[in-house]
């Protein structure tokens, strides 16, 4: 069957799926539209029902596409173009992995047809599609592939690469062979006419360049688009059925939603039949001019559901809450804990009368995944069913009607008030079908405190909140238009009691479509949890910003005398710096720490240190895999990136990672601006003198953070000390404009080193809340200061103010830094900003005492002493780049930057090695590093060593670190040499440190336990 490759189809719109019913068309045109719709439906039904049993499935696709290009487009070009493109994409994706069609001329012509029709104006995407075909082996035995690909390269003026490509086809004996030779001969004639002549040196270069061009890094866009929307599809039968018998609520933003949506084919067929049949013969034809639909919403957006309660003797009350989640069936009842557990995939419910065997379900899922590509992508919004609740608790549901034509009729019936008195049950229900062991909360007691002011986050506070909800109710009249449903941004009140109202129960206020399938990645139940939780956290009765982050509130704090000793809990200490350009640090006294709004007695910092090994066991299961290394091409010059910190470059890298960031368990994306960072800073500065602290509540996680103080402020970020509702201290890094790069790097480090104990020496990111204008990175908090703080502390202890750090302590910290650099370099991460104030002190106090002699393997308690490496905002992931890639700085360099940066030369790992030298120099000399360059081009320290230092050790270290990029035969990273020097230092410590190093560490450990920020700059020396 022949395809006209010269035909062109112009114009394409992605959001039309049927023939538009034009106004003023003739009856013959309507009949023609109806016939085309019926033919289209017949083809779609054959694709779904007959394709799997056909000997030649490509033949059906060809018939369908030729019918569209010859009949459909002639009647309606716009809709026909979309249908043609969708059909071609489905055909290419469905057939591409069938070995029979790899070198079928018909299949190759469809690829070329698609490229010429829809990608002709995009050279990058056209070339990427050809590269994808080449790597998949599609058409590589056919001359047509090389001819068309060479034409594309020729038009882009890659003349020699196009010639080499034709020669490659001839070497592979592609058919028809004689035609390919003629094409090659004609092309050589054209090159001679253009005076493009090859020489002996240009031929190998052309072949190497062609090999580089044939390496594809991402699949074509339409394939990535399909994978985004279909591979994460999950069947409704595999999750708790919370969507049955509920009305249509406001549709939640779909994190995994693509522009193409999988829809029910049966509903689509019925809709097409309905559109074609609704043409009255005696109807008056209207004017064909299009009118602007101001309030029309073709997607039939869902509407909020709420309850109106009339309690005798009280004002009418409206509760934005979906009670159909509590009573999904006549004989079933769930409490709020069970509902949240089911939403998160932690609670499985076996419906009565609905038995599905595992074999049947698995077979059905496999068939659906295989045929999913054949289904036209549409959005299906079926009408909602009336909610069903038990008779004893039946209440009226007020929601906007989806059918405007019947709004008047329903309005009269819905506004009727039915007064019913009952108590909403919140007791836990024990069910045998638990996906995990979930603890059952004790039932509420009637003797719970009813005090309106609760200052501690305790059982009494929980009972108080629940008791406010467990009261009699009745359904009053509808809410008036003038009623205020907004919330203020900031409120100051004297305690921590919060009302259980709309802004606090947002996660349960939405009604889901019972027929709508949730799109999610089938990886882990935890991933599905975040997806479904995010979709259920929107309500249309609140201001738009309340969807994403609750107002920041301030509370007046008072010191509480500890009565009950809280259990000791170990947590990892956190980042307390804002990264580079740290300017100021706000005073934090023991009074502010002890005046917690959450706990009676905050946990001592020395007892809140978590072993990273435990954390790594609980790490996310579906972190992105390490991207495979690029294929190294011999004699290829290294890639040099001029502006390595460019936001556009980072955005490009993040757009190509797989899986994408929004699938990370601790990544929470909000599709809205927040504009709260400056307001948060202002309120904190005003309220800290009154001992009132703002509270930040992230709705997608339910995490509450009380801002305790300001740790640091830079050019783009401010770091706050925040206390969680569990009493854990966290560092909250607020960055404007929003940034995700540091979170990505830290997530990659945690995943790639998940089996290594070195993670205890790297700060951990708990979560990232990303808004359009700013980002909130939640980090673990380290309370013992930085290496720079330790240096300044040692200087202050000296009488003349010029004290320096103990040499053995310098060696110990140097060894710990080398261990971290070795590991992150092994997994392709360059820190890029290594300096004293990005290294935190980690002197944990576990039960095991510190041994008298230094142990390099960490025994005798030495594994609990070390550093934290923080601030990965200027880091690089070398696995995203070709091997040997280097960077050129576009910022002004100084003595704190490596020699390559200052000389304007390319660099890579040299930045970390020079940074390590700078940290060591600061510890030894008590001042920032200064270097001079010798006549032979090598660098050395400007300041000489003291006579009593171990010059044989420090000389070797600085010579290697300062000149890491000088040796021509030195391959970076030079991990083996770093390990060799580290072993030298460790051997010296084991042989000579004896009790001295232990005593020094215990001494500074005691000093740092009382360490408090005094609001003075860190970088002072």
Curated annotation (Swiss-Prot):
Keywords: ATP-binding, Cell cycle, Centromere, Chromosome, Kinase, Kinetochore, Nucleotide-binding, Nucleus, Phosphoprotein, Serine/threonine-protein kinase, Transferase. Residues 1-35, 351-370, 398-420, 511-545, 567-600 are annotated as: Disordered. Residues 569-580 have a biased composition (Basic and acidic residues). Residues 47-212 form the BUB1 N-terminal domain. CDD domains: STKc_Bub1_BubR1 (cd13981). Changing residue 733 to R: Loss of activity. Autophosphorylated. Present with 414 molecules/cell in log phase SD medium. This is Spindle assembly checkpoint serine/threonine-protein kinase BUB1.
């Amino acid at each position: 069957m022949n395809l006209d490759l010269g035909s062109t189809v112009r114009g394409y719109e992605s959001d039309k799926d049927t023939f538009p019913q034009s106004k003023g068309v003739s009856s013959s045109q309507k009949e023609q539209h109806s016939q085309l719709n019926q033919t289209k439906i017949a083809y779609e039904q054959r694709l779904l029902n007959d394709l799997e049993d056909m000997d030649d499935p490509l033949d059906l696709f060809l018939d369908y596409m030729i019918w569209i290009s010859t009949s459909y487009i002639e009647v309606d070009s716009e809709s026909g173009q979309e249908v043609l493109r969708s059909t071609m994409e489905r055909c290419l994706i469905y057939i591409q992995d069938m070995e029979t069609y790899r070198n079928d001329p018909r299949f190759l012509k469809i690829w070329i047809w698609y490229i010429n029709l829809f990608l002709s104006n995009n050279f990058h995407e056209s070339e990427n599609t050809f590269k994808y075909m080449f790597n998949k082996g599609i058409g590589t035995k056919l001359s047509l592939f090389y001819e068309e690909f060479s034409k594309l390269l020729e038009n882009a003026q890659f003349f020699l690469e196009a010639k080499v490509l034709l020669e490659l086809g001839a070497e592979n004996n592609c058919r028809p062979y004689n035609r390919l030779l003629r094409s090659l001969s004609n092309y050589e004639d054209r090159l001679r006419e253009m005076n493009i002549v090859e020489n002996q040196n240009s031929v190998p270069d052309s072949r190497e360049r062609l090999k580089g061009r044939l390496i594809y890094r991402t699949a074509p866009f339409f394939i990535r688009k399909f994978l985004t929307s279909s591979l994460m599809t999950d069947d409704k039968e595999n999750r708790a059925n919370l969507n049955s018998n509920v009305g249509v609520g406001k549709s939640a933003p779909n994190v995994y939603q693509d522009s193409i949506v999988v829809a029910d084919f049966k509903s689509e067929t019925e809709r097409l039949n309905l559109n074609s049949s609704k043409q009255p013969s005696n109807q008056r034809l209207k004017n064909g001019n299009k009118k602007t639909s101001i309030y029309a919403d073709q997607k039939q957006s869902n509407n909020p559901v709420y309850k109106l309660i009339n309690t005798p003797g009280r004002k009418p009350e409206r509760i934005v809450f979906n009670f159909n989640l509590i009573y999904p069936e006549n004989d079933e009842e769930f409490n709020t804990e069970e509902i949240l557990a089911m939403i998160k995939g932690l609670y499985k419910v076996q419906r009565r009368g609905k038995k599905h065997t595992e074999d049947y379900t698995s077979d059905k899922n496999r068939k659906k995944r295989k045929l999913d590509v054949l289904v036209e992508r549409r959005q299906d919004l079926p009408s909602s069913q009336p909610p069903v609740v038990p008779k004893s608790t039946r209440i009226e549901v007020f929601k906007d009607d989806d059918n405007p034509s019947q709004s008047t009729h329903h309005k009269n019936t819905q506004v009727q008030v039915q007064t019913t008195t009952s108590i909403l049950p919140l007791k836990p229900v024990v069910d045998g079908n638990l996906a995990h062991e979930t603890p059952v909360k004790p039932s509420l007691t009637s003797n719970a405190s009813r005090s309106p002011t609760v200052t501690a986050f305790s059982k009494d506070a929980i009972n108080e909140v629940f008791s406010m909800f467990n009261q009699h109710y009745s359904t009053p009249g509808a809410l008036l238009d003038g009623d205020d449903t907004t919330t203020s941004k900031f409120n100051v009140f004297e305690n921590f009691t919060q009302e259980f109202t709309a802004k606090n129960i947002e996660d349960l206020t939405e009604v889901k479509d019972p027929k709508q399938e949730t799109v999610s990645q089938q990886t882990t139940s935890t991933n599905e949890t975040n997806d479904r939780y995010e979709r259920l956290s929107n309500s249309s009765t609140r201001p738009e910003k309340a969807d994403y982050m609750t107002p920041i509130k301030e509370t007046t704090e008072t010191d509480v005398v500890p009565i009950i000793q809280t259990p000791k809990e170990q947590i990892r200490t956190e980042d307390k710096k804002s990264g580079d350009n740290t300017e100021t640090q706000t005073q934090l006294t023991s009074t502010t720490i002890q005046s917690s709004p959450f706990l009676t007695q905050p946990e001592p910092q020395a007892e809140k240190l978590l072993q990273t090994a435990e954390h790594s066991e609980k790490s996310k299961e579906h972190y992105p895999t390490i991207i495979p290394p690029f294929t190294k091409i011999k004699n290829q010059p290294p890639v040099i990136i001029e502006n390595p910190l460019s936001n556009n470059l980072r955005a490009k890298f993040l757009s190509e990672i797989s899986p994408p960031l929004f699938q990370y368990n601790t990544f929470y994306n909000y599709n809205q601006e927040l504009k709260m960072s400056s307001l948060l800073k202002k309120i904190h500065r005003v309220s800290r003198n009154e001992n009132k602290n703002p509270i930040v509540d992230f709705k997608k996680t339910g995490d509450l953070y009380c801002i305790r103080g300001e740790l640091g402020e830079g050019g783009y970020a401010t770091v706050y000390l925040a206390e969680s509702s569990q009493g854990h201290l966290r560092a909250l890094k607020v960055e404007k404009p929003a940034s995700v790069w540091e979170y990505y790097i830290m997530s990659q480090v945690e995943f790639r080193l998940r089996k290594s104990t070195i993670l205890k020496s790297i700060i951990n990111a708990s979560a990232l809340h990303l808004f359009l204008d700013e980002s909130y990175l939640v980090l673990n908090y380290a309370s013992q200061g930085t290496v720079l703080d330790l240096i300044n502390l040692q200087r202050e202890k000296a009488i003349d103010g010029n004290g320096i750090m103990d040499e053995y302590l310098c060696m110990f910290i140097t060894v710990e830094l080398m261990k971290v650099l070795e590991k992150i370099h092994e997994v392709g991460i360059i820190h890029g900003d290594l300096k004293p104030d990005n290294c935190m002190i980690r002197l944990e106090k576990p039960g095991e005492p510190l041994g008298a002699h230094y142990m390099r393997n960490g025994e005798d308690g030495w594994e609990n002493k070390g550093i934290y490496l923080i601030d990965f905002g200027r880091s690089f992931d070398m696995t995203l780049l070709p091997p040997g890639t280097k960077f050129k700085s576009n910022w002004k360099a100084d003595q704190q930057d490596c020699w390559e940066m200052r000389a304007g030369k390319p660099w890579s790992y040299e930045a970390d090695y020079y940074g390590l030298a700078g940290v060591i120099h600061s510890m030894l000399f008590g001042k920032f590093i200064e270097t001079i360059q010798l006549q032979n081009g090598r660098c050395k320290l400007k300041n000489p060593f003291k006579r009593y230092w171990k010059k044989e050790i420090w000389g070797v270290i600085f010579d290697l670190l300062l000149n890491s990029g000088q040796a021509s035969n030195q391959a970076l990273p030079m991990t083996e040499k770093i390990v060799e020097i580290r072993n030298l230092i460790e051997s010296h410590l084991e042989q000579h440190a004896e009790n001295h190093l232990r005593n020094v560490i215990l001494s500074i450990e005691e000093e740092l336990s009382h360490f408090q920020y005094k609001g003075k700059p860190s970088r002072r020396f």
